[in-house]
UniProtKB/Swiss-Prot annotation:
Gene3D superfamilies in the cross-refs: Leucine Dehydrogenase, chain A, domain 1 (3.40.50.10860), NAD(P)-binding Rossmann-like Domain (3.40.50.720)
Any one biological process term the GO annotation gives: tetrahydrofolate interconversion
Function: Catalyzes the oxidation of 5,10-methylenetetrahydrofolate to 5,10-methenyltetrahydrofolate and then the hydrolysis of 5,10-methenyltetrahydrofolate to 10-formyltetrahydrofolate.
Gene it is expressed from: folD2
Binding site for NADP(+): 164-166, 189, 230
MF (Gene Ontology): methenyltetrahydrofolate cyclohydrolase activity; methylenetetrahydrofolate dehydrogenase (NADP+) activity
Protein name: Bifunctional protein FolD 2
GO cellular component: cytosol
């Protein structure tokens, strides 16, 4: 049986450390501030934004939520982003995706000041990540890397297979693994013979959004499995991208769904916001 890499426990430990640092900043008159922007009424997005706001308040951060109608124009959203960019009480700006079809997501993400881009999606920060410079790292991949570190996994020389090539998870997590001296293979919908690729992996990172696509029998004995997927099956059941029951018989360590990578994503957002506040140093007094 595998060791379970408990995302909730790792996130709780990190949040306690963040809360301590927030207190220290507050003594200097700086309150880390996060602005979340939600356009429209997507139920899942509403839940995510609420969770982010609650998490901020729990750790003593300043949180502002902007909810705009689904009919909002790109120009109106850009105007809000510009105001937040110039607001000294806001250190991090998060525009919840997806956006309505009349708004170009890339245009909005590029309008966010790179020093407030706590999601790590601005091309400037993506470029810095690419060349290994200090930057805001995208929250989910960052969470994955912290979990691997906390689980005692040394990636140097390891065969890492990333299944999924999104800009949000697949590509950045592959880069981060490369920076830790892993040999990285990225698999996707056009990959030939996916099972044979996965079977070679010392570490599998699954981020495709297809329920239990990665079969347990594909996992090499003793491999580490990080399952980023969260897929709803039926009314209430949540499953990952990996066939958990079968994979956990072969893996040395595995993340569960729920309770694995999910709790880490918001925690790393809070960490990035804290770091942004430290850098700007002005704050909400």
């Amino acid at each position: 049986m595998s060791t379970i890499i408990d995302g909730k426990a790792i996130a709780a430990k990190l949040r306690a450390e963040i809360a301590t640092e927030v207190k220290i900043l507050k003594e200097k008159g700086i309150i880390p501030g996060l602005a979340t922007v939600l356009v429209g009424e997507d139920p899942a997005s509403e839940v995510y934004v609420r969770m982010k706001g609650n998490a901020c308040q729990e750790l003593g951060m300043h949180s502002v939520k902007h909810t705009l109608p689904a009919t909002t124009t790109e120009a109106e959203l850009l105007a809000l982003v510009a105001r937040l960019n110039s607001d000294p009480t806001i250190h991090g700006i998060l525009v919840q995706l997806p956006l309505p079809k009349q708004i170009n997501s890339d245009t909005i993400l590029e309008a966010i000041s790179p020093v407030k881009d706590v999601d790590g999606f601005h091309p400037y920060n993506v470029g810095r990540l690419m060349v290994g410079k200090p930057t805001f790292q995208p929250c989910t991949p960052y969470g994955v890397m912290v979990m691997l570190r906390e689980a005692g996994v040394d990636l140097a020389g390891k065969e890492v297979v990333v299944v999924g090539r999104s800009n949000i998870v697949g590509k950045p997590v592959a880069l981060m693994c490369l920076q830790q001296h892993a040999t990285v293979t990225i698999c996707h919908s056009k990959t030939r013979d996916l099972p044979s690729k996965v079977k070679e992996a010392d570490v599998v990172i699954a981020a495709v959004g297809v329920p239990e696509m990665i079969k347990g029998e594909w996992i090499k004995e003793g491999a580490v499995v990080i399952d980023v997927g969260v897929n709803r099956v039926g009314e209430k059941k949540l499953v990952g991208d990996v066939e958990f029951a079968a994979a956990s018989q072969r893996a040395s360590a595995i993340t569960p769904v729920p309770g694995g990578v999910g709790p880490m994503t918001i925690t790393m957002l809070l960490y990035n916001t804290l770091e942004a506040a430290k850098k700007t140093g002005e704050g909400n007094r």
